[in-house]
A protein has these predicted regions:
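Beta-strand-loop-alpha-helix segment that lines the small-molecule cofactor/substrate pocket
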Residues: 119-123, 129-199
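Predominantly a Rossmann-like dinucleotide-binding segment in NAD(P)-dependent oxidoreductases
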Residues: 190, 198-240
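N-terminal Rossmann-like dinucleotide-binding module
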Residues: 2-81, 114
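Conserved acidic residues
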Residues: 56, 84, 122, 221
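Receiver (REC) domain switch-region micro-motif
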Residues: 58, 124, 150, 223
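Acidic-histidine catalytic/liganding microenvironments
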Residues: 50, 73, 173, 201, ...
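A structured beta-alpha segment of the ubiquitous adenosine-cofactor-binding alpha/beta core
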Residues: 83-120
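Glycine-rich, N-terminal phosphate-binding loop of Rossmann-like dinucleotide-binding domains
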Residues: 127-128, 227
Length: 240
């Protein structure tokens, strides 16, 4: 590796504080939020603020949170949820989605909903407690065999075995050994991501530039990994 021999300075040559432009999709992705707590609500807010993506459905067992979230982000303050826009559990949505796909394949309407326009989901945001991530992710993947992108809030799970379980489920999704058509292959090629947002925080991006890209600080000799949990997490919710 060629060392940087220029005069040391820690002045950034890039600007990381500028907000990204509003993202406009030619075909806006349709999003399901699982969990209408503070994290799920935060995602919904920034989805609406930063892009033209559409929040089309919510899974939340608490009736008040479900209604509050839906009226703000989906069916409007004076509206009521249409069939497919509100669920009390992710399992109910999986059942609905399985029925929707079958009706699409056969050309028949949804069970008991003749003529109803189905709510279609392209991506799912998993915003439940850490220890529930595995159950939700594997339940969706095994129940549907793929077909939707999934974003999981950090951490991925609470144990290595749990993470491996999700990996194995995702790896095997749709791999039935048969030949796939172009459309079928495209349907299976979805994204699975973990929302490690601090990788993109301005201070971390600046540090990465100074240490790795420009080598202005010096070599990394050791790393102390900490999780600075803010005090507000202690006042209203669980703490890892």
């Amino acid at each position: 590796m060629t060392k940087n021999t220029s005069t040391p300075t820690i002045i950034a040559t890039k600007t990381f504080l500028t907000a990204p432009p509003f993202q406009t999709f030619e075909k806006p992705p349709r999003i399901l939020i699982i969990g209408a707590g503070s994290r799920g609500t935060s995602y919904a807010h920034f989805i609406n603020t930063c892009s033209n993506a559409l929040i089309v459905s919510i899974c939340e067992p608490n009736p008040h949170k479900n209604a509050t979230f839906g009226s703000k982000y989906i069916w409007g303050a004076d509206g009521v949820p249409a069939f497919g826009q509100s669920f009390t559990s992710w399992e109910d949505w999986v059942d609905y989605e399985r029925d929707r796909r079958e009706s699409e394949r056969t050309g028949k309407g949804l069970t008991g909903r003749s003529g109803f326009k189905a709510v279609v989901v392209d991506a799912v945001f998993v915003c439940v407690l850490d220890e529930l991530h595995e159950k939700v992710v594997t339940g969706i993947v095994n129940g549907l065999g793929g077909g939707v992108s999934i974003c999981v809030e950090k951490p991925l799970s609470v144990s290595l075995n749990s993470c491996i379980s999700m990996y194995n489920a995702l790896k095997g999704a749709g791999n039935d050994g048969g030949e796939k058509s172009g459309d079928e292959k495209k349907e299976k090629e979805r994204i699975f991501g973990i929302c490690h947002v601090l990788r993109y925080s301005p201070h971390n991006m600046l540090l990465r530039q100074l240490v790795l890209e420009e080598e202005k600080i010096g070599e990394v000799l050791s790393v102390e990994h900490v999780e600075p949990v803010g005090w507000w997490h202690f006042s209203h919710s669980y703490v890892r």
